[in-house]
Curated annotation (Swiss-Prot):
It is found in: Cell inner membrane. PROSITE patterns: MFS. This is Putative multidrug resistance protein MdtD. Belongs to the major facilitator superfamily. TCR/Tet family. GO terms for cellular component: plasma membrane. The chain crosses the membrane at residues 12-32, 49-69, 77-97, 102-124, 138-158, 165-185, 195-215, 220-240, 263-283, 286-306, 329-351, 393-413, 431-451. Pfam families: MFS_1. It is a multi-pass membrane protein. Keywords: Cell inner membrane, Cell membrane, Membrane, Transmembrane, Transmembrane helix, Transport. It comes from Klebsiella pneumoniae subsp. pneumoniae (strain ATCC 700721 / MGH 78578). Its main location: membrane. One of its GO terms (molecular function) is transmembrane transporter activity.
Length: 471
C-alpha cells in the first residue's frame, strides 16, 4: 500500500480508527457490569440491558447504513456516525440511572451501526480494486486489536479509576476522528434505488418488540398484558414484512434468498448458533467477579486468551473446513463449544484457576471456527444478484442473535437467582451452575440444524468462492 497517495493512506487510518472504536466498545463494557450495578444501585442481573440496547440498535440500523452512505455521501455519514458514537459515549459517562445509561447506549449503537459498514464502503471507493484486500486487512487489524485490549483495559479503568472512563476514553479519539473525517475524507455518493422504508420499519419493530418481550417481566417489570401486546406487535410486524416482501423486487431483503437451501440452513444455524455464542462473553466476566470474587482487572485479563484463540484459529479455519467439510466442522464445533463451556464452569467451581486460561483459549478457537464456517456456508452458493442482500441480512441476523443471547443469559440468571445473588458463596455457585447447564443445552441445539447440511456441500468451495470474490 506504500504506492497509494498520502491522502488515501490518511483516509484508511480514519476508517481504521472507526473500526477500533467500535470493536473496543463491544468488549470493554462486559468487565465493568458488576461495578456499574453497584454504582447505579441495581442488581447485577439487570445489567445485561446495557449490552442488549447497543447490539439490538446496531442490528436494527444496519440495513439503512449502506443506503444512507450512497445517498448522502460516505464522508457525511461516517462523520455523523463518529459524532453520534462519541456523543453517546459522553451521555453514558454522565448517566446516573440504568435507564439513562440504556438510552445513551442506544444513541451509541446508532453511530456504531453506521461506522463499520460505511467504513468498508469507503475503502471500496477510495482504493484500487487490486489493492482492496491489502487495504481491508490494514483497516480491520485495529478491529481485531480492540477485542483483545477491551476486557483488560476495562478492568484497569474500573479498578483504578471508575467505570465512567470506559466511555470517556472514546471522546478524544472521536473528536480527532470527526475533524479528520471532515478535512481528509472525500464525500462519494452514488445513484441509489428507492429505500424500502416500509420494510425497514416493519423489521425494526419486529426485532425490537420481540427482543424486549423476551426480557419480559423479569428484566423490564412489565405486566403480562403488556408482554402479550409486545409479542403480538412483533409477530404481526414480521408477518406483515413477509406479505410486503412477497413478489416485491424493491424489498429490503428479497424472499428469493430463502429458495437457496444452503443459505436457509446457514442463516438458521447462524441465528441459533450466535444466540449461544453471544451468552459467553457476557456471562464469563460476570461469573468471574460475582461467582469467584475476581477483581475487574483480573477478570479482564482472563478474557484475553479467548480472543487470542479466536485470532489464531482464523489462520487455519479454511484448511480445517477444506479437510473435513462444513457439516462435520459445524456439528463438532457446536457440540465442542457446549462441552467447553461446562468444562470452564466445573474447573472454576473446583478451584482449578490455572486451567481457566487454557479452557478460554480453546473456547475462542472453537468459536472462531464456527463463525467463519457459518458465514461462508450461508453466503457461498448465492448468485451474484443476491449476494449483497444476503450479506446484509446475515450481518443483521448476527447482531440480532447476539442481543437475544445476552437477553436469555440475563433471563436465566434472574430465573435461577431470584434476587439472591448476595447470599453465601455456595448459593451463588449453584445459580451459575444451573445457568451454565442451561446455556450449554442452548449452545448445543444448533447441531441439529447443521446436521442437515448435505454431504454435497463441497469443502473446496470455500477457496473457490474466496478467489472469485477477490478477482
Amino acid at each position: 500500500m506504500t504506492d497509494l497517495p498520502a491522502s488515501v493512506r490518511w483516509q484508511l487510518w480514519i476508517v481504521a480508527f472507526g473500526f477500533f472504536m467500535q470493536s473496543l466498545d463491544t468488549t470493554i463494557v462486559n468487565t465493568a457490569l458488576p461495578s456499574m450495578a453497584k454504582s447505579l444501585g441495581e442488581s447485577p442481573l439487570h445489567m445485561h440491558m446495557i449490552i442488549v440496547s447497543y447490539v439490538l440498535t446496531v442490528a436494527v440500523m444496519l440495513p439503512a447504513s449502506g443506503w444512507l452512505a450512497d445517498r448522502v455521501g460516505v464522508r457525511n455519514i461516517f462523520f455523523t456516525a463518529i459524532v453520534l458514537f462519541t456523543a453517546g459515549s459522553l451521555f453514558c459517562a454522565q448517566a446516573s440511572t440504568l435507564d439513562q445509561l440504556v438510552m445513551a447506549r442506544v444513541l451509541q449503537g446508532v453511530g456504531g451501526a453506521m461506522m463499520v459498514p460505511v467504513g468498508r464502503l469507503t475503502v471500496m471507493k477510495i482504493v484500487p480494486r487490486d489493492q482492496y484486500m491489502a487495504a481491508m486487512t490494514f483497516v480491520t487489524l485495529p478491529g481485531q486489536v480492540g477485542p483483545l485490549l477491551g476486557p483488560a483495559l476495562g478492568g484497569v479503568l474500573v479498578e483504578y479509576a471508575s467505570w465512567h472512563w470506559i466511555f470517556l476514553i472514546n471522546i478524544p479519539v472521536g473528536i480527532v476522528g470527526a475533524i479528520a473525517t471532515l478535512c481528509l475524507m472525500p464525500n462519494y455518493t452514488m445513484q441509489t434505488r428507492r429505500f424500502d422504508l416500509s420494510g425497514f420499519l416493519l423489521l425494526a419493530a419486529g426485532m425490537a418488540t420481540l427482543t424486549l418481550a423476551l426480557d419480559g417481566q423479569k428484566g423490564l417489570g412489565i405486566s403480562p398484558a403488556w408482554l402479550a401486546g409486545l409479542v403480538a406487535v412483533g409477530l404481526c410486524a414480521l408477518l406483515l414484512y413477509l406479505w410486503h416482501a412477497r413478489g416485491n423486487a424493491r424489498a429490503l431483503f428479497s424472499l428469493n434468498l430463502f429458495r437457496n437451501r444452503t443459505f436457509s440452513l446457514g442463516l438458521g444455524g447462524s441465528f441459533a448458533g450466535r444466540i449461544g455464542s453471544g451468552m459467553l462473553p457476557f456471562m464469563t466476566p460476570v461469573f468471574l467477579q460475582i461467582g469467584l470474587g475476581f477483581s475487574p482487572f483480573h477478570a479482564g485479563l482472563m478474557m484475553i486468551p479467548m480472543v487470542l484463540g479466536s485470532m489464531g484459529m482464523k489462520r487455519i479455519v479454511v484448511q480445517v473446513v477444506n479437510r473435513f467439510g462444513y457439516r462435520r466442522v459445524l456439528v463438532a464445533s457446536t457440540l465442542g463449544l457446549a462441552a467447553v463451556s461446562l468444562l470452564f464452569m466445573f474447573s472454576a467451581l473446583a478451584g482449578w484457576y490455572y486451567v481457566l486460561p487454557l479452557v478460554l483459549f480453546l473456547q475462542g478457537m472453537i468459536n472462531a471456527s464456527r463463525f467463519s464456517s457459518m458465514n461462508t456456508l450461508t453466503l457461498k452458493d448465492l448468485p451474484d444478484d443476491l449476494a449483497s442482500s444476503g450479506n446484509s441480512l446475515l450481518s443483521m441476523v448476527m447482531q440480532l442473535s447476539m442481543s437475544i443471547g445476552v437477553t436469555i443469559a440475563g433471563l436465566l440468571l434472574g430465573l435461577y437467582g431470584q434476587q439472591h445473588m448476595s447470599l453465601d458463596a455456595a448459593s451463588t455457585h449453584q445459580v451459575f451452575l444451573y445457568t451454565y447447564l442451561s446455556m450449554a443445552a442452548i449452545i448445543a441445539l444448533p447441531a441439529l440444524i447443521f446436521s442437515r447440511v448435505p454431504d454435497d456441500v463441497g469443502s473446496n468451495t470455500v477457496l473457490r468462492r474466496r478467489n472469485r470474490s477477490g478477482s
